[in-house]
Amino acid sequence: MRDFIQHLQDRGILENFSSGLDNVSTPVSAYLGFDPTAPSLHIGHWIGICFLRRMAHFGLTPVALVGSATGMIGDPSGKSIERTLLEESQVAYNSQKLSECLAYYLPGVQIVNNIDWLKETTVIDFLRDVGKHFRLGVMLGKDTVKQRVQSEEGISYTEFSYMLLQSYDFAYLFENYGVCLQCGGSDQWGNITSGIDYIRRHGLGQAYGLTYPLLTNSQGKKIGKTESGTIWLDPKLTSPYELYQYFLRLPDQEVPKVARTLTLLSNEEIFDLDQKFLLDPVAVKKFVAETLVTSIHGEDGLREAQVVTQSIHPGKVSSVSEKDFQDLVAMGQAVSLEGTQALGKRWIDLFVALGVCSSKGEARRLIEQKGLYVNSEPIENEHSVFEETQVCFDQYVLLAQGKKKKLVLRLI
């Protein structure tokens, strides 16, 4: 354990750990939980996935827990208001999708689900066997609970009970799977230490906890959230291109932290990047973005991201091959129209009809700002029409709104 902890400290991604953990010399099994609040993992979960991979690299036995049972309750940690409770069928669906995702990213890692042991537990048994080991004074003193109790929103008994369920999970894994270490983000420290105390009070043995810092920007907001929503790992929800662009647009000062937290580059490679970053932050940012997209979506995902990126830059359409257009169509970045329905029509009307712009007013404003593109060339004015000379490879036209919205118009 000492080498693992030293690695995390050197990398700057260790927040807290239990006293004595660094002296444990016997093989350690450790777990990290994922609640199924959505049908996909998001970029914040990638921290946990990388953490589990690091554990395996240093000889620990990682276990991933899907929290179907706890997902029915909702973790109050880091939340200022209560989560909306999900239907049981939705939790079951989300759990299945998360299990598939974890199995893909963590081949060989054991995946367990707490519904398997909590579904048979009665309320009476839970209160007698688990509840009696917890003291309200201690629970109310936990930061997450304290903040919610003092807030206008308050905290429901449902959320208040989450700590007990997570503690029971830890004890169950300790007793049945030999798991003595629970890991998680820094906002989980209170829940983790409650589990350690419960295991001790129950006379099961010595357990430990370890947390890593949450990935936040300079304003303290979690990285992975945008104005348009969450950055998902599922390519159907967040395309490789969108993921790539998200990291390319990160403020320069966030890049070293992202490289340390979200990549599996060695510490030596990270330290080397730090030096290169001082000389050329843009090049390092591009490298980190490419590394992350490849790790999450593979080489094909990176190529997809690069193809779309190349195709939407002004003046670059001449370098887009017919195969690139075909790839864009295959990626779902296309709409088909009969040539007679499109040729000769005003572009301002087509951009609205195709959903690239929400209204003609928006389209006019963007045209004035040189923000609407046909084949990477800005539309000159609102009277510009679709001409046959703009068709590439007899059937394709590349449309874009700025650098974000892009669409291939395919003539049939």
Curated annotation (Swiss-Prot):
Domain of life: Bacteria
Enzyme class (EC, first level): ligase
Residue ranges annotated as motif 'HIGH' region: 36-45
Reactions the enzyme catalyzes: tRNA(Tyr) + L-tyrosine + ATP = L-tyrosyl-tRNA(Tyr) + AMP + diphosphate + H(+)
One record GO biological process: tyrosyl-tRNA aminoacylation
One GO CC term on file: cytosol
Motif ('KMSKS' region): 222-226
PROSITE patterns: S4 (PS50889)
Principal location: cytoplasm
Ranges where the S4 RNA-binding domain occurs: 345-412
Positions contributing to ATP binding: K225
UniProt keywords, alphabetically: Aminoacyl-tRNA synthetase, ATP-binding, Cytoplasm, Ligase, Nucleotide-binding, Protein biosynthesis, RNA-binding
UniProt: L-tyrosine binding residues: Y31, Y162, Q166
Keyword Ligase: yes
Cystine crosslinks: none
EC number: 6.1.1.1
Entry's localization field: Cytoplasm
GO MF annotation list: ATP binding; RNA binding; tyrosine-tRNA ligase activity
Pfam families according to UniProt: SYY_C-terminal, tRNA-synt_1b
Stated family: Belongs to the class-I aminoacyl-tRNA synthetase family. TyrS type 1 subfamily.
Task performed by this protein: Catalyzes the attachment of tyrosine to tRNA(Tyr) in a two-step reaction: tyrosine is first activated by ATP to form Tyr-AMP and then transferred to the acceptor end of tRNA(Tyr).
Known partners and oligomeric status: Homodimer.
The name this protein goes by in its record: Tyrosine--tRNA ligase
Annotated organism of origin: Chlamydia abortus (strain DSM 27085 / S26/3)
Gene coding for it: tyrS
